[in-house]
Amino acid sequence: GKGWSPGSVEESRRTRNPAGVKFASCDEFMAKLPAGKPFWSWFSSRHPHRPWTDARENKVGLRPEDAVVPPHLPDHPTVRDDILNYACEVMDFDREAGEMVRLLEARGLLDDTLIVMTSDNGWQMPRGLANCYDSGTRIPMALRWKAKVLAGQSIDAFVSLADLAATFLEASGVPVPEDMESLSLLPLARGETQAGRDAVFVERERHANVRQGDLSYTVRGIRNREFRYLRQLNPDRGP
């Protein structure tokens, strides 16, 4: 995957990759780690990004009748097949993540490593990717850090990907600046009670220019526990 847009150093005329040094595999990265030194790395998978694998070809036992079709999508066999293909892609990512966890364990690094698994957007369906509806902004997130993250809990709280900044600072022993809007997730992960957020803000600006004239569908929004308010800044561009 790419850590920034457009993702090509050559096309942007940059002299270095702003996302950091790129490695061919997680195994290669770990092989080059200095012994006893802290490290930070991120893995951006192409799963579950379209094009999706045909679930029937993978023979994973998924059945169209088992698919859960959201109310805003038509309950049609084609849609059900697409949902199964998406589920198959999620399983592919799960296998990739499992391989990296096993590599950490084999090198004796697993228990001392904070692992964050999340996504940058919802699935690539209507109201999903590059949209500010819940199916586009409500994404999975899981943390693992033995002895420092309470395992097996499910947290019902508003969090933002911006909160990863403060989370990584705290995990590294670096003070979080008082004027930083990012909130560390570690207190919640430890099972502690904290004030947290009562709403999250979302926006869409330039991503996925799918309107005439290579224009985007600019949106600003806020989501609390009761309502979602979205404002289209350029309504003349259509939905």
Regions found by a protein language model. Give the residues of each.
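Active-site segment of extracytoplasmic enzymes that catalyze sulfate/phosphate-ester chemistry
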Residues: 1-3, 8-14
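Residues that form or immediately flank small-molecule/cofactor binding pockets and catalytic motifs
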Residues: 2, 146, 190, 204-206, ...
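Active-site-proximal cap/lid insertion segments
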Residues: 5, 27, 31-180, 215, ...
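Acidic, His- and aromatic-enriched active-site or binding-groove loops in soluble protein domains
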Residues: 13-30, 38, 199
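Two-component system phosphotransfer/interaction surface
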Residues: 169, 186-190
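Glycine/proline-rich active-site loop of Rossmann-fold NAD(P)-dependent oxidoreductases
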Residues: 176, 195-196
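Polar, glycine-rich mid-to-C-terminal structural blocks
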Residues: 183-187, 196-206, 217
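N-terminal small/polar-rich segments of proteins
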Residues: 210-211
